[in-house]
Amino acid sequence: MKFQSFFSSVLIFFTTSTLLLSIPHPVSANRSNQSSFLQCLSLQLNDSNIVSKVIHTPNDTSFSSVLASSIQNQRFSAPDVPKPVLILTPVQPSDVQSAVKCARRFGIHIRTRSGGHDYEGLSYVTHKPFVILDLRNLRSITVDVDNRSVWVQTGATIGELYYEIGKKNRTLAFPAGVCPTVGVGGHFSGGGYGTLLRKHGLAADHVIDARVVDARGRILERREMGEDFFWAIRGGGGSSFCVVLSWKIGLINVPSTVTVFNVTKFSEQSALKIIHRWQFVADKVSDDLFIRVMLQRYKNMVRASFPGLYLGSVKNLLKMVNKEFPELGLEEDDCTEMSWIESVIWFAELGEEPINVLTKRTRASLAFKAKSDFVQEPMPKTAISKLWRRLQEPEAEHAQLIFTPFGGKMSEIADYETPFPHRKGNIYEIQYLNYWRGDVKEKYMRWVERVYDDMSEFVAKSPRGAYINLRDLDLGMYVGVKRSKYEEGKSWGVKYFKNNFERLVRVKTSVDPSDFFCDEQSIPPFTFVEVI
């Protein structure tokens, strides 16, 4: 009786709610499909306790908090941003299977969310009726120290992953990003990089198995899915092909002592000299050394920061930098020795907290827009100076430019080994970011566009590359033109994936020919023509 009562209450929502009437779509057909979907899902779950934990309708008190909890870009929390008709929070893998099977049967559009860090909000926003599949409850992490491997569910964050590794062993690590609240689901499936990329490459380079739910609702591991499918989800964006439930990753060794450091400059002349020289050094120096460049405003001044990680002692670091990069002016007082897991906290700017600070899930308070580029030839000082002046503009109060060095392991892995193609020949990647508070966004977004335009002659061309994990809808998206999605998707797909785009399309055509898993920039199948 309890289950039937709960099911009746949620079904009544779908048959009577005026919320759905405000969404422009064929109302009667979609409402019928949504009710049928809910009935299908509720019957498959078949337990009132599970149903109440998994299904959240707009009438539920939990709906708003669940929706908002993983919105990491406040640009997509405004009242006029489309909201889902339903949020599902699976508590076990079979719940995901049920959701996919029922959604496919009744034509329900699903968006899958892990940590909510999609830069354009595509894991939780679209302009047609949709359901969010939020994987927050699938976050178990099993560390096998003896075999140097981990099974991690995709609702976990990289901070939680780092914490579990650090608890077990201080000389094992994983080469993923620096922001601890990023979900491992999207991060690994887009490539994923951090301070260890020059020594060990991308996170995706160390994925050795995966469990997914495919478009037919089957749970598959690497052996069952095949090597092409497995290749595609390690850098090609998993949400185009399946729902990734968990990853098996291989851990890497790090020294018991590493060194972090930071050098800051406020003088434009001093900063430009160092940045210009950095371009000739950062990708060629020992792969034990990672030095990032960050440009941003600080108390109405432009500040250049050079934070870095060295896999070794301060003594050896200073010896190397004084020889290879004396322009940096690195001194012993700029450096601190610590364990690798402590360096993760340092780069995340979390202070001197215990390592369990990495498990905290915080919600971003600012809106932002971002773009990315890859640089293959050193920029002249005039170009760097132009960036400095852009940061002095009023709209750049919270802007940030991040230069991430490549080389090392990144140059040793062929560009076709995973879908991420930006390997050998790239000196560094630039990320252009601008943050703001409030609803007035146009001037801040235009600032990013101006900077991006300024850099056009100094970055990779044919195509001008971009990183899928720094998603940018300005590159293009499906707009409903009556031509093949392949022709539309290729225009931006080659920017993210270069020659690997064609192989991704072949995989998509094989594993999801009806395009069940899709979004505004998803990989298209060859066979599918539709108005989105």
From Swiss-Prot:
Binds 1 FAD per subunit in a bicovalent manner. Keywords: Cell wall, Disulfide bond, FAD, Flavoprotein, Glycoprotein, Nucleotide-binding, Oxidoreductase, Secreted, Signal. It is an enzyme of class 1 (oxidoreductase). Disulfide bonds join C40-C102. Glycans are attached at N30, N33, N46, N59, N147, N169, N262. Its EC number is 1.1.1.-. SUPFAM superfamilies: FAD-binding/transporter-associated domain-like. Residues 80-254 form the FAD-binding PCMH-type domain. PROSITE patterns: FAD_PCMH (PS51387), OX2_COVAL_FAD (PS00862). It holds the Pfam family FAD_binding_4. Its main location: secreted. It comes from the Eukaryota. It is found in: Secreted, Cell wall. The keyword Protein biosynthesis does not apply. Its cofactor is FAD. Belongs to the oxygen-dependent FAD-linked oxidoreductase family. This is Berberine bridge enzyme-like 18. It comes from Arabidopsis thaliana (Mouse-ear cress).
